[in-house]
Curated annotation (Swiss-Prot):
Listed name of the protein: 4-hydroxy-tetrahydrodipicolinate synthase
Site label Part of a proton relay during catalysis, positions: T45, Y109
Catalytic activity: L-aspartate 4-semialdehyde + pyruvate = (2S,4S)-4-hydroxy-2,3,4,5-tetrahydrodipicolinate + H2O + H(+)
GO CC annotations on file: cytosol
Pathway the protein acts in: Amino-acid biosynthesis; L-lysine biosynthesis via DAP pathway; (S)-tetrahydrodipicolinate from L-aspartate: step 3/4
Native organism: Sulfurimonas denitrificans (strain ATCC 33889 / DSM 1251) (Thiomicrospira denitrificans (strain ATCC 33889 / DSM 1251))
GO MF terms held by the record: 4-hydroxy-tetrahydrodipicolinate synthase activity
Family in the record: Belongs to the DapA family.
Active site: Y136 (proton donor/acceptor), K165 (schiff-base intermediate with substrate)
Enzyme class: lyase
Complex formation: Homotetramer; dimer of dimers.
Residues the record lists as binding pyruvate: T46, T206
The keyword Amino-acid biosynthesis is assigned to this record: yes
Length: 297
């Protein structure tokens, strides 16, 4: 399998008059390609996937595949649900659209056991058995943690499961996983600890901040994977203020606001129950953004 590693961006989904802004979405993806991002990730948490219709979900993936075709940038598409059958349907749809790999968030709200998580992921991955497949662990949102034992079991038993996006915020979890299975591809799912995860054997990142600063995030990863840890850490340290500011409200509220302030999207629209940030937080993110050179479309 030709797996996806390196710098990946959890794409926002721009709306205009309540609908998917296809032109803006295409331009955002082109900007990622032009700034060296290894893969774009449509319809994940940052893309407000939980409030997209099935048709919108599919269209986002189709646009990403169309724009990335023939470039060095791949498409790592989201296909998650708290219903295993729905997640299988989403994974098969993504595969038919021509994506390069699939990631799937742990089922939220239903609080399955570790055995339930194992069976859930096994069923989804085996439904697209020739497609590279990544787990996505974000217990702060799903209220369930895919344990290290379950990750290892899935990696050992299911041939196309090659990695995990770790958004627990725990460096210890990454160290444990890689000490037990060095060949497992662990991605940082938390912008604040991208460098520590890469320095401890991580294979890549899935970033929110790279929507805004893809050039810096791409370079951070490239340096780390080439052994320039001093250079990678310097970029990570420089990005600390913006990484922090982008999460003062629930993601993707602040990254969308930042993209709007930067002129990278024309309208600041969310799907309920998400709403625009407070005036105070808009001022905070705008102030922090002044410290960075943000490249246009």
């Amino acid at each position: 399998m030709d797996i996806v590693t390196g710098s990946t961006t959890a794409l926002i989904t721009p709306f205009k008059n309540g609908k998917l802004d296809e032109s803006a979405y295409a331009n955002l993806i082109k900007r990622q390609i032009n700034n060296g991002i290894n893969a774009v990730c449509p319809v994940g948490t940052t893309g407000e996937s939980a409030t997209l219709s099935y048709a919108e979900d599919k269209r986002c993936i189709e646009i990403a595949v169309e724009i990335c075709r023939g470039t060095a940038t791949k498409v790592l598409a989201g296909a998650g649900s708290n219903s295993t059958s729905e997640a299988i349907e989403a994974a098969i749809t993504a595969q038919k659209c021509g994506v390069d790999a699939i990631f799937s968030v742990a089922p939220y709200y239903v609080k399955p056991s570790q055995e339930g998580l194992y069976q859930h992921y096994k069923a989804i991955a085996e439904s697209v058995s020739d497609m590279p497949f990544m787990l996505y662990n974000v217990p702060g949102r799903t209220v369930v943690d895919i344990s290290a034992d379950t990750v290892i079991r899935l990696f050992d038993d299911v041939k196309n499961i090659y990695g995990i996006k770790e958004a627990t915020g725990s460096l210890e979890r990454t160290v444990e996983l890689l000490s037990r299975r060095p060949e497992l591809k662990v991605f940082s799912g938390d912008d604040a600890i991208d460098y520590p995860i890469l320095a401890n054997g991580g294979a890549g990142i899935t970033s929110v901040t790279s929507n805004l600063l893809p050039d810096l995030k791409s370079e951070l990863v490239k340096k780390a994977l080439n052994g320039d840890f001093t250079g990678s850490k310097a970029i990570n340290d420089m990005l600390f203020p913006i990484n922090k500011a982008l999460f003062i409200e629930s993601n993707p509220i602040m990254i969308k606001a930042a993209m709007y302030i930067a002129g990278l999207i024309d309208t600041l629209e969310y799907r309920l129950p998400l709403v625009a940030p407070s005036v105070e937080n808009m001022k905070k993110i705008e102030s922090v953004m002044k410290n960075y050179e943000i490249k246009g479309l």
